[in-house]
From Swiss-Prot:
Optimum pH is 7.5-8. It catalyses: chorismate = isochorismate. Gene3D superfamilies: Anthranilate synthase. Monomer. The keyword Plastid applies. Pathway: Siderophore biosynthesis; salicylate biosynthesis. One of its GO terms (cellular component) is chloroplast. It comes from Arabidopsis thaliana (Mouse-ear cress). The keyword Chloroplast applies. This is Isochorismate synthase 1, chloroplastic. Keywords: Chloroplast, Isomerase, Magnesium, Plant defense, Plastid, Transit peptide.
Amino acid sequence: MASLQFSSQFLGSNTKTHSSIISISRSYSPTPFTRFSRKKYESCSMSMNGCDGDFKTPLGTVETRTMTAVLSPAAATERLISAVSELKSQPPSFSSGVVRLQVPIDQQIGAIDWLQAQNEIQPRCFFSRRSDVGRPDLLLDLANENGNGNGNGTVSSDRNLVSVAGIGSAVFFRDLDPFSHDDWRSIRRFLSSTSPLIRAYGGMRFDPNGKIAVEWEPFGAFYFSVPQVEFNEFGGSSMLAATIAWDDELSWTLENAIEALQETMLQVSSVVMKLRNRSLGVSVLSKNHVPTKGAYFPAVEKALEMINQKSSPLNKVVLARNSRIITDTDIDPIAWLAQLQREGHDAYQFCLQPPGAPAFIGNTPERLFQRTQLGVCSEALAATRPRAASSARDMEIERDLLTSPKDDLEFSIVRENIREKLNGICDRVVVKPQKTVRKLARVQHLYSQLAGRLTKEDDEYKILAALHPTPAVCGLPAEEARLLIKEIESFDRGMYAGPIGFFGGEESEFAVGIRSALVEKGLGALIYAGTGIVAGSDPSSEWNELDLKISQFTKSIEYEATTSLQAIN
């Protein structure tokens, strides 16, 4: 990680009248004063790499232009095409900037349904927030303590945003080197609190220093993108938006950006059909685990041996498994994700697919952090039990989970580690509740929320650097656990268990990329899961837990054992 050096950036604001536009929000800055050069990451298929720009030089403008609301995606598409043409005829007089054109739609349409209609245009992304109904809102509690959230920035203006789908890339951020503070500043350069829906969606590798396997190469060490065309689903309404980003210093002019957007807009479909709950229409021909069951048991025993050594500081390590499935036909990753979404209202759903890359999809229950201006919230999630068909049996399992010494140890390690890390970057930390059970569709976990208040928004990078990786996906101490994982695991986790989410000018939110799969045409899918090994862990129980965690993926595909096909090594 780069050293934590922060610099302030002046952002002014201005508004001007624009025909057919009912509101404009903008931040703009003085003329660029320096040019910063760094090693380029080659990619000719996507706009410009924002990491190659001078993060010390503010953009000329960051603005959002909102058109009048319409009734349908078709009308919104027509309105956007017209607005892009108008922008081309009356261009902003800046050498760099970001302009978001957005059209509200007076009906709620699923963002994932819109994405499915776009005929696999790449790059593409999807991020769906989970439902937090029934859980305390610690960010809101902190806001109320400071006067009902007025002026302290702990309440989001987009709290009813349900999910986001995007295609194309107005600007992307990618490199083979680990994500650094400079990279974070490069992303923040394209964002503004006055345009809160301009966001960079993406993720980072679990181990940024590890060797990148071929299936993960297109993702680099990290990958983020501000979509060219974006569909926002809100509670009760929707929005179609287009974003243009340019920087003359990166040889990507406003004219280049508009032409690229117009090409993408020609491919946008306005015919949106709701994805129905139906079979994916594929059968599994073979399934192979890495490690195999025979190799996994000794790996757990080795981890336990280290944990039980008095001279070893290690008290937890998370060992993962990679399950490759080969299917008779290609799996549609968006249709697969839609099935997960129907079951996973209490989880984040995501899809991340750079151009020419497999689709990384997931249905993760775990939040890494959410920042709303100065408020930051994280959570501890650990220990696993299955759900039961009857409520009486389900309560028995819940009581067993709450009273298990082994599970309490695993959970306490996670919670106290996150509390310690937040204490290092926040002026105070609230934990509520200390321990409870969080029930998902197929499993239940021990759970707690933690929240605090940053001294300044620029501390956001510190949150990411401090919290990732959590003990829930790596272990404790983190470095000792990482080294053991590197020694034991024979596959590349890639972005599995890494931070997945978005950076925004007003708000950022990241989930932990667990319960996830990498889907590629002609190659089936790689499904990832992991379990925490602590003193008292049983290899057989941990293996069964891995099967339980991937069941949300495998349940939707009919498995047909075929003896004529060999397992893949």
